[in-house]
Amino acid sequence: MHMRLVVIAIGRLKQGPERQLAERYRERFDDIGRKLGFRGLDIHEIPESRARDAATRMAEEAAAIAAAIPDNSMLVCLDERGHNIDSATFAGHIGRWRDEGVAATAFVIGGADGLSPELRRKAKLGVAFGAATWPHQIVRVLLLEQIYRTATILAGHPYHRA
């Protein structure tokens, strides 16, 4: 069985260096991932809510995110309250889920107001990229790099030299 990886992100990456870098890591992953039992890396961009208050924005975005999560997925939330884990541990989770026959892993990146508490509770794993707060565009690039790095770790490729 092949595991599908899905990135669900609030907001759109406009043309420019962030989008180019994100695409580069996605393409690199695709080159290695298929050989490792991954069925591709899909990216779903969800428009930011235009609601006036943060609670409504977060609720609207959470509903759109929930609708985009594939059935029977492992849910990973990128969240400043998440765990700071190293790349090998991150790769270990994804590799183990693949080996256990999980159909999909969905990585969720919230908008400016973050992720709803309900989504965070449903997550199998919450991940933070350090203690700093990052713009969601940068988080997407960091996530795609870590997904590519995961593939290289699982393949024994020399990209990861830690």
Swiss-Prot record:
Catalytic activity field: pseudouridine(1915) in 23S rRNA + S-adenosyl-L-methionine = N(3)-methylpseudouridine(1915) in 23S rRNA + S-adenosyl-L-homocysteine + H(+)
EC number assigned by the record: 2.1.1.177
SUPFAM superfamilies listed in its UniProt record: alpha/beta knot (SSF75217)
Gene3D superfamilies linked to this entry: 3.40.1280.10
Keyword S-adenosyl-L-methionine: yes
A molecular function GO annotation: rRNA (pseudouridine-N3-)-methyltransferase activity
Keywords attached to this entry: Cytoplasm, Methyltransferase, rRNA processing, S-adenosyl-L-methionine, Transferase
One Pfam short name: SPOUT_MTase
Protein location: Cytoplasm
Residues binding S-adenosyl-L-methionine: L78, G110
Main enzyme class: transferase
Keyword Nucleotide-binding (UniProt): no
One Gene Ontology CC term in the entry: cytoplasm
Broad class of where this protein is predominantly found: cytoplasm
Family from the record: Belongs to the RNA methyltransferase RlmH family.
Database matches in NCBIfam families: PRK00103.2-3 (NF000989), PRK00103.2-5 (NF000991)
Function: Specifically methylates the pseudouridine at position 1915 (m3Psi1915) in 23S rRNA.
HAMAP family according to UniProt: 23SrRNA_methyltr_H (MF_00658)
Quaternary structure note: Homodimer.
The protein's name in its UniProt record: Ribosomal RNA large subunit methyltransferase H
Species the sequence originates in: Bradyrhizobium sp. (strain ORS 278)
